[in-house]
């Protein structure tokens, strides 16, 4: 038996997310079909992060266990051959059998790119978020300082399941102004569903002047989804890296 780890990049605008959803286009389904063609047996792919529809990845990781003589390098070439141009396998490795892409992960890093000028070039529509109004960068930094650390993020998750612990520790948040873009980077051991997008949406509300810093503090304390901001569009979100 072999445990193969793949590092994957994909254009999320072409898929209904990472996870299989009936017969709708998904990254997981396409990779599973590609591997199945190579090994001639059903294969289950485990993903490190379940990115939503429209969310991209530069460093997604998945693994699968299979009885085969095919080498890791052959899987790199073969999966790239059988998948569409919207998916690229950039690395393939054979791991110990106890390795799991999701449960072995030590941290995940997401990036959100927000174009902040009056208009955005149309070819960026699927690859950046967009806000045309002025955003106060100093207020964004104050939001950042409040959100770093261990908190109950119930207010910043959609469809929280009863058995999921909403407490998470954000290790790092960086915010950079790069030309006309504001780039948010979040690093944590794990994230809740839509957590990064809701955090960015809430921070933007404060930076725009619609909400106050105290409002954001209360949103954390209230543990109620209605207390926080919107779920910003998925187009600007990228899963950048998984550390093990």
Swiss-Prot record:
Molecular function per GO: RNA binding; tRNA pseudouridine(38-40) synthase activity
Top enzyme category: isomerase
Active site: 52
A Pfam family the protein falls into: PseudoU_synth_1
Positions of substrate binding: 110
Keyword tags: Isomerase, tRNA processing
Catalysed conversion reaction: uridine(38/39/40) in tRNA = pseudouridine(38/39/40) in tRNA
GO BP terms, alphabetized: tRNA pseudouridine synthesis
Transcription as UniProt keyword: no
EC number(s) on file: 5.4.99.12
Subunit structure: Homodimer.
UniProt function note: Formation of pseudouridine at positions 38, 39 and 40 in the anticodon stem and loop of transfer RNAs.
Protein name: tRNA pseudouridine synthase A
Organism: Finegoldia magna (strain ATCC 29328 / DSM 20472 / WAL 2508) (Peptostreptococcus magnus)
Lineage: Bacteria, Bacillati, Bacillota, Tissierellia, Tissierellales
């Amino acid at each position: 038996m072999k445990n193969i780890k793949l590092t994957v990049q994909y254009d999320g605008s072409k898929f209904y997310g990472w996870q299989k959803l009936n017969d709708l286009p998904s990254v997981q389904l396409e990779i599973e079909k590609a591997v199945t063609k190579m090994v001639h047996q059903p294969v289950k792919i485990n993903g490190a992060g379940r990115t939503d529809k429209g969310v991209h990845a530069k460093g997604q990781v998945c693994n699968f266990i299979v009885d085969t003589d095919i080498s890791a390098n052959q899987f790199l070439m073969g999966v790239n051959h059988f998948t569409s141009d919207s998916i690229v396998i950039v690395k393939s490795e054979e791991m110990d059998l106890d390795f799991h892409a999701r449960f072995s992960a030590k941290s995940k890093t997401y990036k959100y790119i927000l174009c902040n000028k009056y208009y955005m070039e149309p070819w960026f529509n699927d690859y950046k978020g967009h806000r045309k109004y002025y955003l106060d960068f100093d207020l964004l930094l104050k939001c950042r300082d409040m959100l770093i650390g261990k908190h109950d993020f119930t207010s910043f998750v959609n469809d929280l399941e009863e058995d999921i612990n909403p407490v998470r520790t954000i290790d790092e948040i960086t915010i950079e102004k790069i030309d006309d873009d504001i780039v948010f980077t979040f690093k944590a051991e794990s994230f809740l569903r839509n957590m990064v997008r809701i955090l960015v949406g809430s921070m933007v509300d404060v930076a725009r002047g619609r909400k106050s810093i105290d409002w954001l503090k209360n949103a954390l304390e209230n543990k109620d989804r209605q207390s926080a901001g919107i779920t910003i569009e998925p187009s600007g979100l990228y899963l950048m890296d998984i550390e093990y």
